[in-house]
Amino acid sequence: MRKNRSAAVAAASFLLVTGAAIASAPSAYAGTPGGTHANDRNTDFNGDGYDDVLVGSPGAAVGGYKGAGMVTVQYGGPKGMGTTNVRAFSQNSSGVAGAAETGDNFGKAVATGDLDSDGYDDAVVGIPGEDIGAVSNAGGVVVLWGTPKGLTGSVSNWLQADDLTTSGRFGTALAAARFSDTTPGDLLAVMDSVGLTTYQFEPATEPGAKSVGPQSRQPQQKARTTLTSPPKTALARSGADEPPGIQPKSMTTGDYDNNGYADLIVSGTSVGDEPGHGWSYILPGTASNDEPLPVTAVRGGPVVASGDINGDGYDDLVTGEPHSPDDGGESMTGGMVGVYYGSSAGPAGQEGPGTPPVWWTQDSPGVPGTNERGDGFGTDLSVGDTNKDGFADLAIGVSGEDIGTVPDAGAFIVLRGAARGLTSTGALSANQGTTRVPGTVEKGDKFGGQVSFTDPNDDGRFGLLVSAPSENTNDGFVWVFSAGTGGITTSGSWSYGASAFGGPTADALYGAAIDD
């Protein structure tokens, strides 16, 4: 049973303004670390051992309010996921904090993690368009607690910025993992338009016991930092004298130095004299009694994902730059993806830490397609082992890909992992015109807008979810691709939208966010 669950922001020692790692001073809890490596899945809301799927539909009309937004959870099982064992939540659902309003965009961002260490993963939903009082688009976050029955929404926690600002968009991106040993649960990172806040929740009194619902409380302590100015204590990598400030866009987590604690990546695009370039800050996770490690910055972003591509036990960092200038800033490309391989010193480039990543484009040998302006190669990324060979594979969204003469129809590409790293051998590319893929190639669908590996039947082979949020004039659809001994296959693929479970469809943008 959960008792007296209150939220407290993790101590400020990890913040970029100090240049220290993610660690905090309170005495450590005993317990097995969870959620440290990228493949430590944390999407099991009912504790049955099967991954569940959390999908955001931020454009959904709820109670007549356009763009109020909703999320759905599809529960995994021996036969995988479907459209029958589904729950939908909005701010009009009983127990969910707030109320549905026009333009709230509930579900614009989603994340999962066991925040209270009770054995049931929890769902975190970003609401960046939330108006609070007279402050428009201040943003907010709702935590839906996992139970033996899954997500119930009977009680939820509400989080918001300490200092409300117009267009602050608190909840723009979310991530949860075990960054330190200050609590047995996962810490929650919440991004807004300029910075980052982390939250720590008290552990459940009786881990694994049947939940009767937590007490909903506001955070007791708060710590903040902005990222739009260069952190003075951050160490630059990848050929820059000083890392720039960034407009933060996304986050990912992984144990890149394999020290037993997750590291947090905050990614965005540069601001200042040379705007628009992708950069990512690495905030290392450490034990609370260890000397904090310095924050470092590497080229690449604003899209990021993590996983062990070469099977060496270190998570690797993958960055996507779908619309940014190339390294020289002289021309636009169709997008590029960078791979930093994990090491004892954290993510390392081609020649070790502090060097550029291994760059991939559609002009790289063996990669399907051709590098063309507007392709959006790297629109979204996901890393997972699709054939159970011990090497994680990389899914790449190419949402701006033209299919024949149809502009921006979209596609996805899967590159395989291997002992030597990412390889184009055995690469797969598919779109709505590919044999056995449901649907029709249409202008502006942006198929590949989201890609997410998931293993809802727990067979060790990660299938792939691919969304086209613009499908059917912004209604949105999600495609399900299974995995076999050869990895991802289009055989047996199927698709669904919000109508499959009676949800609102018009301009719903279903699949605009999928937890990864």
Language model segments and positions:
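Blade-edge motifs of beta-propeller repeat domains
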Residues: 2-9, 14-39, 75-105, 145-169, ...
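Beta-propeller blade termini
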Residues: 32-51, 56, 107-120, 171-181, ...
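Acidic/hydrophobic-patterned starts of short beta strands in beta-sheet-rich repeat architectures
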Residues: 47-56, 117-128, 181-191, 258-267, ...
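Hydrophobic strand positions within the blades of repeat-based beta-sheet folds
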Residues: 53-55, 71-74, 89, 106, ...
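Short glycine/acidic-enriched loop and turn motifs that connect beta-strands
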Residues: 59-64, 129-134, 194-196, 269-274, ...
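A detector of repeated loop/turn-to-beta-strand junctions in beta-rich toroidal repeat architectures
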Residues: 66-70, 83, 122, 135-140, ...
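Mobile, glycine-rich extracellular loop/lid and propeptide segments
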Residues: 102-116, 120-130, 135-146, 158-160, ...
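Core solenoid repeat modules with strong leucine/isoleucine-rich periodicity
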Residues: 252, 259, 264, 303-307, ...
